[in-house]
A protein has these predicted regions:
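RNA-interacting cores
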Residues: 1-251
């Protein structure tokens, strides 16, 4: 099961919350969850959730977005936060409080539904060019270093691994499929800037902005790529997605 909790945060100052505070909001989540579940999460190699904060110009407020990719994670994270977060939140690290404007659970889907929405489309409806807007700084690790420019292989690898770890219906555990995905995907344009993301006194290389991916090859492969990029809206893109990085949406 996939689900997203959107929490509207009221702030008169548009600069009062910055990207690097994602780790502070992560700490607030951990404070709200049951201690046994927190320990369980700390022992996982892949997290079944992502979270980040960004400013929504249309709503004119900050949005704290928490997404989960399993039923268990929804019950233990999203459902708990809905009940435990009231009209205000307090960030101990900054010693600041914010009013909560709204809370809503959106985008509830099963894995089968996200598969069907991509594989049962008419060929004319399939996207061969996908625009990706990065809502928060994004990174991945290569050769022991965090990077400041997107790599098709690194970004797909993260999505591919998370899908196979958490999907309860459809497995993509086939090296040939992954190889074909890489061969038939290409970044064709981008408008990005580098960003130093502060995480626990460490400044990570990252990037933020927009880029587009061209999908080639047979229609089944295009469907898989569309499906994985749809999935990225829940699990995040790249590394440190539980710490506020890798927030994205399809344009």
């Amino acid at each position: 099961m996939l689900a997203t909790l959107q929490i509207g945060i009221d702030s008169k100052d548009k600069n009062s919350i910055n990207y690097s505070q994602g780790s502070i909001f992560h700490g607030l989540i951990m404070e709200k969850l049951e201690s046994d579940y927190v320990e369980y999460l700390h022992n996982l190699s892949l997290n079944p959730y992502s979270q980040y904060v960004y400013f929504d110009k249309e709503k004119d407020n900050f949005v704290w977005q928490i997404s989960t990719v399993t039923k268990e994670a929804k019950e233990n994270i999203i459902d708990v936060l809905v009940e435990s977060i009231g009209d205000r939140i307090y960030l101990k690290h900054n010693e600041v409080s914010y009013n909560i404007k709204s809370k809503s659970i959106v985008g509830i889907k099963t894995y089968q539904e996200i598969v069907d929405s991509n594989f049962l489309q008419k060929d004319s409806d399939k996207k061969n060019i996908i625009g990706i807007k990065l809502l928060t700084p994004t990174t991945y690790k290569a050769n022991g270093e965090y990077q400041f420019f997107p790599s098709i292989q690194a970004l797909y690898c993260s999505l591919y691994n998370k899908w196979n770890a958490f999907s309860d219906k459809v497995s993509l555990a086939d090296e040939e499929v992954f190889k074909h995905i890489l061969e038939h995907s290409l970044i064709i344009k981008y408008n990005l800037k580098s960003y130093k993301y502060c995480l626990e006194n460490v400044r990570l290389n990252s990037f933020i902005g927009n880029f587009s991916v061209l999908l080639k090859g047979p229609k089944e492969l295009v469907s898989i790529c569309n499906m994985l990029l749809d999935y990225a809206e829940y699990c995040g893109l790249g590394a440190k997605t539980s710490m506020g990085m890798g927030g994205m949406k399809i344009e």
